[in-house]
Regions:
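Extended ligand-binding regions for polar small-molecule ligands
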Residues: 25, 67, 71-76, 227-266
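Acidic, polar ligand-binding/catalytic clefts
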Residues: 83-148
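Periplasmic-binding protein-like
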Residues: 47, 127-134, 200-203, 207-244, ...
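Short helix-initiation/N-cap motifs at beta->coil->alpha
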Residues: 84-96, 141, 160, 175-189
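Ligand-binding clefts/hinges and TM-proximal coupling segments of bilobed small-molecule sensing domains
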Residues: 26-31, 83, 162-174, 244-273
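Extracytoplasmic small-molecule ligand-binding "clamshell" domains
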Residues: 30-105
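Alpha-to-beta junction loops
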Residues: 79-81, 99-108, 153, 189-201, ...
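C-terminal motif of bacterial Sec signal peptides marking the signal peptidase cleavage site
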Residues: 18-23
């Protein structure tokens, strides 16, 4: 075998190997821009996804706070609505280590240092506020001002930030219960007129734990609540791009507008004044 022939074979072998590696990379779903599908942004949420985060369990509609935020972020990143693909995942699998079949996941993930060891988390798109949960038959149902609500019997869970919020905003001392579940039982029995808890928990209580529950009002934002962020695969190339998009949406007031629309106006949950 001549030297030129040996070189030609070596080059051909290297080319085949490179092609095989390229094929493997393509098969794993990792495109050149860090998405699982070329030209698409794949976003996951829970199954089912609840209002007011996603309306009618249809994230593709763009209705609901988190669905609207997801599309706003996608637009800032250069993706048209038609280029957004939705998938479903459980909460726990989303924050577990390992590869993912989505680019972003949004379902009320609190930004947490422990979680960041397993996955990437974006900057915050929402900081929780405190809210008032009551029933349609309670005398507190129409008390949507500080002066009126402070006259009601308010319950909170022990160890929660709700205790300080009630004292600071309403100027009264609430009844403290061992858990949110105990507070719900007290509300059902008429022992208290309303519960104060964080807004996401309030929506859950009203929808799932109370037959005639309603979130009647929310406290003014104080910036002290849990912060929600997107979850991304560990080391994702998109994390910095999502952060940049969120910063733009915060600076131009879009996040505030979406929060007002979907967590206040559409839910008829006024801010206490």
């Amino acid at each position: 075998m001549t030297r030129p022939l040996r070189i030609s074979i070596a080059v051909a072998t290297a080319a085949v190997a490179a092609l095989a590696l390229s094929s493997c990379a393509s098969g794993s779903g990792n495109s050149a821009v860090g998405t699982v599908a070329d030209g698409k942004l794949t976003i996951a949420t829970g199954q089912p996804a609840y209002s007011p985060w996603v309306e009618d369990n249809k994230p593709q509609s763009g209705k609901g706070f988190e669905s609207a935020v997801a599309y706003a972020v996608a637009k800032e990143m250069g993706y048209a609505k038609s280029d957004v693909v939705w998938k479903r995942s459980t909460f726990d699998s989303a924050i577990a280590p390992g590869p993912k079949d989505w680019d972003l996941n949004i379902q009320q993930f609190s930004i947490d240092a422990k979680r960041k060891k397993a996955v990437d988390m974006s900057s915050a798109y929402y900081t929780t506020t405190q809210a008032v949960v009551t029933t349609s038959g309670s005398k507190a149902v129409d008390d949507t001002t500080i002066d009126s609500l402070k006259k009601d019997a308010i319950g909170v869970a022990t160890g929660s930030t709700s205790i300080a919020s009630v004292k600071d905003v309403l100027g009264v001392t609430p009844q403290v219960f061992n858990s949110n579940d105990d507070a719900v039982l007290a509300l059902k029995s008429g022992q208290i007129d309303a519960i104060v808890t964080d807004l996401p928990t309030a929506f859950y209580m009203a929808a799932a734990q109370l037959d005639d529950g309603t979130v009647s009002a929310q406290f003014p934002a104080d910036g002290k609540g849990d912060q929600f962020g997107f979850v991304l695969p560990k080391g994702s190339e998109l994390t910095s791009k999502v952060d940049k998009a969120l910063q733009t949406l915060d600076d131009d007031g879009t996040l505030k507008q979406l929060q007002t629309k979907w967590l206040s106006s559409e839910t008829n949950t006024p801010v206490l004044k």
